[in-house]
């Protein structure tokens, strides 16, 4: 496949029957899609399955791409939805720290050593996991992946105001949950009981 083909051209070529176009599209974006899946679910096995589900769905539904957003936005939407579906179905919980994610991203104090930083990552990952699904997806896309509100809204298929609200609520919960990391004199809070997932 020509390297200078745009994502839109590759997707159109796939729909037209080119057997290599979709593979090239996946090759371009798989690392980013994988990072989103892993950060959303937290478990590498579940993330791999969710990403596979998403790519199969994108492969089969390519003819439904309307062109009202970028192909990458469309792909991310499918991946996020696949992850949220799997979370709701399996009630997955993170068992490992998020990749390429450190305490600085939430303005946390750096650890004195690798072990302390790893423990901090585990705590942050668990705090993210305790957010309702929709709030976690919004926080991950906007605050960790760096998407603008408007693009995150397109990925999540909801109004920009809803994304802002979910981010605000999610940040507030994270700040409360992680306050003990900023202030060592504060005890770590008890984990909230499960059952709030999916709330807006």
Question: PLM ranges: what are they?
Answer:
Residues 3-7, 93-120, 187-198:
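Internal acidic/polar
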Residues 9-13, 123-132:
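Short amphipathic alpha-helical boundary/capping segments
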Residues 10, 34, 44-61, 145-147:
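Conserved RNAP core-binding helix
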Residues 12-35:
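A short, charge-rich alpha-helical start-of-domain segment used by transcription regulators
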Residues 15-16, 39-44, 53-70, 89-92:
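Sigma70-family region 2
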Residues 35, 49-56, 69-81:
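Structural recognition of an alpha-helix C-terminal capping motif at a helix-to-coil junction
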Residues 45, 126-137, 141, 145-162, ...:
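Helix-turn-helix DNA-binding module
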Residues 60-67, 77-98, 109, 116-117, ...:
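Arg/Lys-rich amphipathic alpha helix in sigma70-family domain 2
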